[in-house]
């Protein structure tokens, strides 16, 4: 999930198939890019103003990425604590969606651009289960598979 990421994006760079969005869905790769990689566009999208949604999966994956960074020697213990505090602040500002049975059922069905890994499918299914029209949602991601599917499903991508 934390592989190669696209260049930093700004609001004006958001790929929007049908107008402006009213809230953002934060996918794990964007949160990790904001907190660990210094991606200014991701940081603005993740920590800036506005309404945000995320899956509980987003915060589990992000916390694991922080732990891996410390274990790999990229962070010391104090750096890990600082980033985890920032992650908790992001989580507190989000409406967090549980990984529910309907999300898992949707994740098990095909998406427009296959193959899709299971965790990516859970993110995409979570967005769909929010029940909003795609024109109202921007998906914030640095993951190519999420980006391709989000655009194919009619969502704006940042």
Regions found by a protein language model. Give the residues of each.
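Active-site neighborhoods of divalent-metal-dependent phosphate/nucleic-acid chemistry enzymes
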Residues: 2-12, 93-145
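C-terminal binding/interaction regions
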Residues: 135-137, 145-158
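Short, well-structured N-terminal submotif of metal-dependent ribonuclease cores
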Residues: 1-59, 69-82, 155
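Residues that scaffold the ATP/ADP-binding catalytic core of kinase and kinase-like folds
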Residues: 33-35, 65, 149
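General small-molecule cofactor/ligand-binding pocket signal
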Residues: 53, 97, 158
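Active-site-proximal, substrate-binding regions of enzyme catalytic domains
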Residues: 38-39, 57-112
């Amino acid at each position: 999930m934390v592989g190669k990421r696209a260049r930093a994006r700004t609001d004006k760079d958001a790929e929007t198939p049908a107008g402006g969005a009213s809230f953002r869905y934060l996918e794990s790769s964007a949160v990790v890019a904001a907190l660990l990689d210094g991606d200014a566009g991701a940081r603005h999208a993740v920590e800036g103003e506005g309404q945000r949604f995320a899956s509980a999966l987003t915060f589990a994956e992000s916390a694991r990425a922080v732990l891996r960074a410390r274990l790999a020697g990229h962070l010391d213990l104090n750096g890990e604590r600082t980033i985890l505090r920032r992650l908790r602040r992001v989580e507190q500002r989000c409406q967090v969606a549980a990984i529910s049975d309907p999300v898992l059922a949707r994740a098990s069905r095909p998406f427009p651009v296959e193959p899709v890994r299971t965790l990516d499918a859970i993110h995409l299914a979570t967005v769909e289960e929010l029940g909003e029209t795609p024109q109202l949602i921007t998906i914030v991601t640095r993951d190519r598979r999420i980006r391709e599917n989000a655009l194919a499903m009619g969502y704006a991508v940042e």
